[in-house]
């Protein structure tokens, strides 16, 4: 369009540069502007820092002007904000302002480099009257009504040189080509550009209104967290529908996130009784419900685990949870999925919350179903590793070893279930569910308790084969049982998660225990100094290392 007329008359451009230099020192010559901007862009594309010396040298080599003139024109471009001066690590370089859009505030100031480019029609109007400079300024200002006054002033200054009216859009149009913007089109994008920051896609006519009132849109994104914390009026009509058909809702149709208050309402708890709803309280209610239905069993620390029959002996917890979920459907599947996920994430964090929940609900309400399931030993499959660990940890101390030791590991205040509810084998140990049943499980006459490496007894439940005397032959569960009896039940689960058997235990270094198991420093030091180190010394003094390592 306006590009071809700019090239033929070179004397017009020369007259324009002299007139610009004489009349207004603040406006840079379009040829110089194009040369300097192209030089900066080419230097940046070659990853060379466009400092003053490089720019002057390259402009002189390509086009011939002296460095002093290039320096003066560069200063004018900096005043027009077409070039930015950047100081980085003590050295000053220059950047093309049209390429630097993100740092500008609110996405409005990219208008200055675009202003003359977006208004070729406005610049084409003044050729009949080239002499007076005032007419182009109001035309340019009218072409960009929604821009900042500084941008309008820069556009007016850029269109101020009188004679090259048609010649001005030429270099701008040529420079617009590498920027991938056709000359006639960009009249609309600058108007739509400012609202792109705060708004998604408003109509161009509402650009000014969008800039004046940016406050109403932002409160919409944080609405879901508020919906989870305090009950707004809309959810109650939707609330009764998801829980009864939880499985169907997950099978087909989009899943809607369930708030904590809806879960509490569905489980029958009083939502506003205890003040603010926390995740721990809701998890406690979920555990009550699952334990009452007999779907989950409560362990000694108050956490819930799948029944023994639903979990293979050595399968990882994720696989056992998946197998259990495949067996169930409907709301029990939803409850158990939530329970498994929350138990894996927050087992240790929410331990105190679970115990407090257990103290709120009477003890007689919960163990009835759980004891019934636990005492029917015939219904269950093989005993899992985790349950065996909990079972061993709850056995009473051996009568011969009772003196000189502190309270047993299972005698802490966190024990929620009674001892009678945790005697797992159906006919092996005779224990009643009454309140005065003896807590230590009696040993069968043919199996005396053998002291371990540190003097702790093993032989607690009937029918279980004893732990080998040599630590090399210990399985993962023997290691877990050893540390549980030694008074470190929480740390024993870390050994179980890492699947550390006797051989690995004897090879552990001090740093492995302190940093590799994700357990606290105090218990880790005690475990290493008083147990692992003692076992290693005893083993390597008794046995030869070749036989162990082989």
Curated annotation (Swiss-Prot):
Keyword set includes Phosphoprotein: yes
GO MF term list: chromatin binding; DNA binding; low-density lipoprotein particle binding
Domain SAM: 474-542
Described purpose of this protein according to its UniProt entry: Unmethylated CpG islands (CGIs)-binding protein which localizes to H3K4me3-decorated CGIs, where it acts as a transcriptional repressor. Tethers L3MBTL3 to chromatin and interacts with the KDM1A histone demethylase complex to modulate H3K4me2 and H3K4me3 levels at CGIs. Plays a role in atherogenesis by binding with LDL on cell surface and promoting LDL oxidation which leads to the formation of foam cell.
Highest taxon listed in the record's lineage: Eukaryota
Record's compositionally biased regions (Basic and acidic residues): 290-300
Signal sequence bounds: none
Biased composition (Pro residues): 1-11, 125-138, 180-205, 214-245, 437-448
Coarse class of the protein's main subcellular location: nucleus
SUPFAM superfamilies: SAM/Pointed domain
Entry's free-text remark on domains: Winged-helix (WH) domain directly recognizes and binds unmethylated CpG-containing DNA via simultaneous interactions with both the major and the minor groove of DNA.
Protein name, per record: Atherin
Residue ranges of the region described as Disordered: 1-32, 93-468
Low complexity bias (residue ranges): 12-30, 139-160, 170-179, 246-257
Skewed-composition ranges (Acidic residues): 337-355
Modified residues (Phosphoserine): 163, 270
Known partners and oligomeric status: Homopolymerize into a closed pentameric ring. Interacts (via SAM domain) with L3MBTL3 (via SAM domain); the interaction mediates L3MBTL3 binding to chromatin. Interacts (via WH domain) with KDM1A; the interaction modulates KDM1A function.
InterPro entries found in the cross-reference section: SAM (IPR001660), SAM/pointed_sf (IPR013761), SAMD1-like_SHD (IPR056983), SAMD1-like_WH (IPR048589)
Organism: Oryctolagus cuniculus (Rabbit)
